Curated annotation (Swiss-Prot):
<keyword id="KW-0793">Thylakoid</keyword>
<dbReference type="InterPro" id="IPR017896">
    <property type="entry name" value="4Fe4S_Fe-S-bd"/>
</dbReference>
<feature type="binding site">
    <location>
        <position position="114"/>
    </location>
    <ligand>
        <name>[4Fe-4S] cluster 1</name>
    </ligand>
</feature>
<dbReference type="Pfam" id="PF12838">
    <property type="entry name" value="Fer4_7"/>
</dbReference>
<feature type="binding site">
    <location>
        <position position="74"/>
    </location>
    <ligand>
        <name>[4Fe-4S] cluster 2</name>
    </ligand>
</feature>
<feature type="binding site">
    <location>
        <position position="70"/>
    </location>
    <ligand>
        <name>[4Fe-4S] cluster 1</name>
    </ligand>
</feature>
<keyword id="KW-0150">Chloroplast</keyword>
<keyword id="KW-1278">Translocase</keyword>
<keyword id="KW-0408">Iron</keyword>
<feature type="binding site">
    <location>
        <position position="104"/>
    </location>
    <ligand>
        <name>[4Fe-4S] cluster 2</name>
    </ligand>
</feature>
<dbReference type="GO" id="GO:0048038">
    <property type="term" value="F:quinone binding"/>
</dbReference>
<keyword id="KW-0520">NAD</keyword>
<protein>
    <recommendedName>
        <fullName>NAD(P)H-quinone oxidoreductase subunit I, chloroplastic</fullName>
        <ecNumber>7.1.1.-</ecNumber>
    </recommendedName>
</protein>
<feature type="binding site">
    <location>
        <position position="107"/>
    </location>
    <ligand>
        <name>[4Fe-4S] cluster 2</name>
    </ligand>
</feature>
<keyword id="KW-0934">Plastid</keyword>
<feature type="domain" description="4Fe-4S ferredoxin-type 1">
    <location>
        <begin position="55"/>
        <end position="84"/>
    </location>
</feature>
<comment type="function">
    <text>NDH shuttles electrons from NAD(P)H:plastoquinone, via FMN and iron-sulfur (Fe-S) centers, to quinones in the photosynthetic chain and possibly in a chloroplast respiratory chain. The immediate electron acceptor for the enzyme in this species is believed to be plastoquinone. Couples the redox reaction to proton translocation, and thus conserves the redox energy in a proton gradient.</text>
</comment>
Length: 175
């Protein structure tokens, strides 16, 4: 009889513990139900990228000294730098500069190690094209100023996903 009572006590303890685990699962589910959805309606809603977002690379032709540091630090030797040595000035003269964004991994090494800061990362992430050869940007395309998501009047800006942190997420542009 004593063994039977012990079995009933153990069973009831395990049943209460199982109910607690199920209750914890429901609490997590209800917590996630109260949050904003993660999915955004992309063409009409856009996320404002974070402050350190690594998007398209912006290039300033006048600042470049054709030192080719960007090519040496690139893990895939991507930037193509064409220059010509001018004997009278004893200096390199930059002819063309290009980056193929179809191959670029957006690591940011070229931007970080550039001695003249002629390269910078922008917040532009819409680089989709039908032909991959259009992703090969020359110095004119790289010099184009980026379009800011915040200035697009046709788009409802999303300040953040709101999924991981609770509360309101402020964009870096408004602070």
């Amino acid at each position: 009889m004593f063994n039977f009572i012990n079995n009933i006590q153990n069973y009831s303890k395990e049943a209460v513990q199982a109910a607690q685990y199920i209750g914890q699962g429901f609490m997590v589910t209800f917590d996630h139900m109260s949050r904003r959805p993660v999915t955004i309606q992309y063409p009409y809603e856009k996320l404002i990228p974070s402050e350190r977002f690594r998007g398209r690379i912006h290039f300033e032709f006048d600042k470049c000294i054709a030192c080719e540091v960007c090519v040496r630090v690139c893990p895939i030797n991507l930037p193509v730098v064409n220059w010509e040595f001018q004997k009278e000035k004893k200096k390199k003269q930059l002819q063309t500069y290009s980056i193929d964004f179809g191959v670029c991994i957006f690591c940011g090494n070229c931007v970080e190690y550039c001695p003249t800061n002629c390269l910078s990362m922008t917040e532009e992430y819409e680089l989709s094209v039908y032909d991959r050869h259009e992703l090969n940007f020359d110095n004119f395309a790289l010099g184009r100023l980026p379009s800011m998501v915040e200035n697009d009047a046709m788009v409802k800006n999303m300040k953040g996903l709101g999924y991981l942190p609770k509360g309101v997420i402020e964009s870096h542009a408004s602070s």
